[in-house]
Amino acid sequence: MIVGLGTDIVEIARIESRIPAAGDEALLTCRLAKRVLTETEFALFVGSTQPARYLAKRFAAKEAAAKALGTGIGRGVSFQHIEISNNDNGAPQVVFTDGASERLSQLGGVKAHLSIADEQHYATATVILES
């Protein structure tokens, strides 16, 4: 049974405008990335050949996950409580910790499905939570 559904779309240029353009070292100072990404995700962001696209997709996925939880970001759920990674086949997956994990339990959720897509100007994500 579906216990939560969330979707989000992000304009990649908007994210790109918030990323320092002075090279790889400047990525280490990106405040938006530090606020949104976990340590593991941040390391991948810094090493990415397309950091704005990477951050936009992670931002959309985390917003979609928070919407599926019914809280959005805030009210006990932060960006740091939601981690986006890839399974062995390369498919995106979402892991909930702390407040996000507690909210998932309150909903009776046991499985999260995540789809991320991007094209030239936009990144989008959808999360479905199942009991």
UniProtKB/Swiss-Prot annotation:
Binding residue positions for Mg(2+): 8, 63
Protein name: Holo-[acyl-carrier-protein] synthase
Cofactor(s), by name: Mg(2+)
A Pfam family: ACPS
Reactions this protein catalyses: apo-[ACP] + CoA = holo-[ACP] + adenosine 3',5'-bisphosphate + H(+)
Family: Belongs to the P-Pant transferase superfamily. AcpS family.
UniProt gene name: acpS
Organism ancestry: Bacteria, Pseudomonadati, Pseudomonadota, Gammaproteobacteria, Alteromonadales
KW Kinase (keyword) present: no
Primary localization class, coarse: cytoplasm
Organism: Shewanella pealeana (strain ATCC 700345 / ANG-SQ1)
NCBIfam families: acpS, pantethn_trn
Listed InterPro entries: 4-PPantetheinyl_Trfase_dom (IPR008278), 4-PPantetheinyl_Trfase_dom_sf (IPR037143), ACPS (IPR002582), Ppantetheine-prot_Trfase_dom (IPR004568)
Localization per record: Cytoplasm
GO MF terms held by the record: holo-[acyl-carrier-protein] synthase activity; magnesium ion binding
Top-level taxon of the source organism: Bacteria
GO biological-process terms attached to the record: fatty acid biosynthetic process
Enzyme Commission number: 2.7.8.7
